[in-house]
Amino acid sequence: MKVKVKHLQRFFSSDASGGIVLIIAAALAMVMANTSVTSGLYHSFLETPVQLRVGALEINKNMLLWINDALMAVFFLLIGLEVKRELIQGSLASRRQAVFPVIAALGGMIVPALVYLAFNAQDPVAREGWAIPAATDIAFALGVLALLGSRVPTALKIFLMALAIIDDLGAIVIIALFYTHDLSMLSLGVAAAAIAVLMALNLSGVRRTGIYILVGAVLWTAVLKSGVHATLAGVIVGFMIPLEEKHGKSPAKALEHVLHPWVAFMILPLFAFANAGVSLQGVTLAGLTSLLPLGIMAGLFIGKPLGISLFCWLALKLKWASLPEGTTCKQIMAVGILCGIGFTMSIFIATLAFGSVDPALINWAKLGILIGSVLSAVVGYLILRQRVTDTRLAV
């Protein structure tokens, strides 16, 4: 018994364990969603209504939306804390290093959209899905990266985090501008006021994390009610919590330490389980001949790494930015392939683009997203494994 416990402790303490659990959860979801015996149970779980009421405020969501909007806000809170630490004390501390993932993210959004339009520009309906391959699923991309464990340079992981956050922010802006028609200006005003309070707390030197979380809950609720993706609130709160150490304690680092195991072994696996169960009913290989899925596949698998690599090369050539310390151009290119994992964010944009037009288009889009994302995950992992191994051997 002691030996089994020791093996479990060793597994959960390894850097790769979170990625393994996430992949298992995603595989289980795919099997359950596409098996007649379990598909009903799977979808019933996701559609379970959950109600939260505080005074006159009432939020009614199903389990899927609570996982995606609430639990994933905690994940983005952790990402915000980690990126802030690296911007101030770590691999993104210099201006040229900090601007590098910003430029990479721009390339990773612009080029995939252009590749998609190269296939679908002539079709006015399909053209509406131009933003589908511009998105990156940060949770799955980091999950695949985690499979490589401690072999991955910290700076490379932070680069992917920063790039994916900017990519996600870009996707949120795109959704708000092009796919959302009922934004609540009142809720956005409340959100702006909550951000102002968070900034005031930070500038006043308030170090009690609980106060930031409380105001953050108000911010999350306001963003949710506004029609904008609520996970944005997590990133903002993460950037507002003080990092500076006093008496040997840093509020941001302490919270980061507490959140890590919960995010790795509960929140991300739940997210994977809730979102990876893509039903393949109605999806046929004949659909692969359609320009819609071909454009998405090409955008994710070719456009993403091409855009990121091209913009990074230009930034380095023009001396606008510099590589994160301890990384190589080949590793950056491999990370660019991983960013082709569009998955949940791409599916979300596809439902917004085609949901009111034709359900068949959503099925075709899902086919392109699934194949493009799987190709990006497998090829990106294999190439990156070789690149980090080569670097370690050279040292």
Curated annotation (Swiss-Prot):
GO molecular function, one term: sodium:proton antiporter activity
Domain of life: Bacteria
Function, in words: Na(+)/H(+) antiporter that extrudes sodium in exchange for external protons.
Membrane topology: Multi-pass membrane protein
UniProt xrefs under Pfam families: Na_H_antiport_1
InterPro entries per UniProt: Na/H_antiporter_dom_sf, NhaA
Membrane-spanning intervals of the chain: 11-31, 63-83, 99-119, 129-149, 158-178, 183-203, 223-243, 258-278, 282-302, 332-352, 364-384
Protein name: Na(+)/H(+) antiporter NhaA 1
Family to which this protein belongs: Belongs to the NhaA Na(+)/H(+) (TC 2.A.33) antiporter family.
UniProt xrefs under HAMAP family: NhaA
GO biological process: regulation of pH
Catalytic activity: Na(+)(in) + 2 H(+)(out) = Na(+)(out) + 2 H(+)(in)
Swiss-Prot/TrEMBL keywords: Antiport, Cell inner membrane, Cell membrane, Ion transport, Membrane, Sodium, Sodium transport, Transmembrane, Transmembrane helix, Transport
Gene coding for it: nhaA1
The species this protein was found in: Klebsiella pneumoniae subsp. pneumoniae (strain ATCC 700721 / MGH 78578)
